[in-house]
Amino acid sequence: RDLNLNAGGEYWLWFPHNLAVAPGYNYHWHDNTKRYELYRLDELAGWGEDGDHPLGMLPSEVELLQQTLDALNSYWSYLTDYSHRGSLYAKWEGKPRTSGEGTWWYVEARLPLMYVWQTLDYQRERLDTTVSRRHVMFEPSFRVYGRWHNFQRGIDIRYNKSVSFPSMTSFIDIRSTDDPLNIRLSNTGLKNSHQHNISVYYYLNSNRKQRYFNTYWSYSITQDAVAQGYVYDKATGVRTYRPENVNGNYNIGGNVNYSMPLDKARRLTLNSALWSRLYNSVDL
C-alpha cells in the first residue's frame, strides 16, 4: 500500500521596476506498508533437488506457509514521512524600451527550506524496532539570463542544488542472505547526498551575415554519494555488499556549434559541431 497527499500554495507580490516576490508553502505526507515473505521450497522433505515431484508441481498452501517461510529474510515495514516546505521565489526583468532592441536581463532565485520527518516500523525475524529521522534541507536555485546587441548575443547561467537521503532501512542493522552468494548489509552511518549543478549557455549571432555561434557547458558534482562496496571471499565465492558514502563523483562537458554560408549566394552552408563530456566516478 502506498499513499501520498500534497497541499500548498503561493502568494504573489508585485513591486515597481518589474520585481515580483512569491512566498510559498507545501505540505507532503507519505504512507507506505510493505510485506516481503520468502519461502524456501527446498526446505520441504521430498521437494528438494533430489525429490520425486515433477517440475512445476507445488505443495499445498498449508505445507508451504508452515514449513518453508524464511523468517531471517522475510520482513514487514511501515513507513510514514511528512515534510513542510517553505520557499521564497523572486524574479526581476529588465525590459528594453523597444521590443527586440537594446539590452534585456532576467534574474530569478528560488530559496526553499524543507523540514522532513520520517519514521519506520520494521519487523524481521526476532527484530522489532522503530527508527525516526529528521532532515532540514536547503535546495536553492538561481538563474541569470541576458540578451543584448539587438538580442543577437546572450548568456544564460543556471545553478541548483538538490539533497537526497538514504532509505530508512539503511539505518537498521540488517543482514540479507536470501541470495547466498550475494549477502547485503546495511550501514547506519550513511549521510545525506548533496548534488550541485551549474550550466552556462552563450550565443553570438549575426543575422545580416547569417553567422551563428553558440556554446553550452555544464558541471555537476555529488558530495557523499552512495556506492555499493563489497568484499569477496575467494574460498566460498560469496560477495558481501555494504553501502558507503564516497566523494569525487563529477561530470563536466559541453558543446560548441557554428554555422556560416560558404558563398555569396548563400547556397552552401558550413555547419560544425564539437561536443565533449568527462565523467569521474568513484567506487569502492
For each predicted feature, which ranges?
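Exposed, low-structure sequence patches enriched in small/polar residues
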Residues: 1-284
